[in-house]
Amino acid sequence: MKNVPTIHPGVVLRKQFLTPMGISRSALARAADMSPVHVNNIVLGRRDVTVDTDARLAAALGTDQCFWLELQAEFDLESEKGVRDNF
């Protein structure tokens, strides 16, 4: 089985949305009614996406609701699998 790197939703947010769309983290924070620190921590992979965060990002970026939660769930499952595989 091939090892695929686990990607945090913050990486997707930065590489597929913010950078190509020319949106700053602070502009996203304003549009999503979130603190700039919260957005920055998601982008840096320091904070996970919650139901509330998913709804705010979906509204601000025009993504489907649950898009960000699904990315988070996939990240969590792959991260957990990696931990278990090390035993």
Located regions from the model:
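The DNA-recognition helices of helix-turn-helix-type DNA-binding domains
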Residues: 35, 46, 72-75
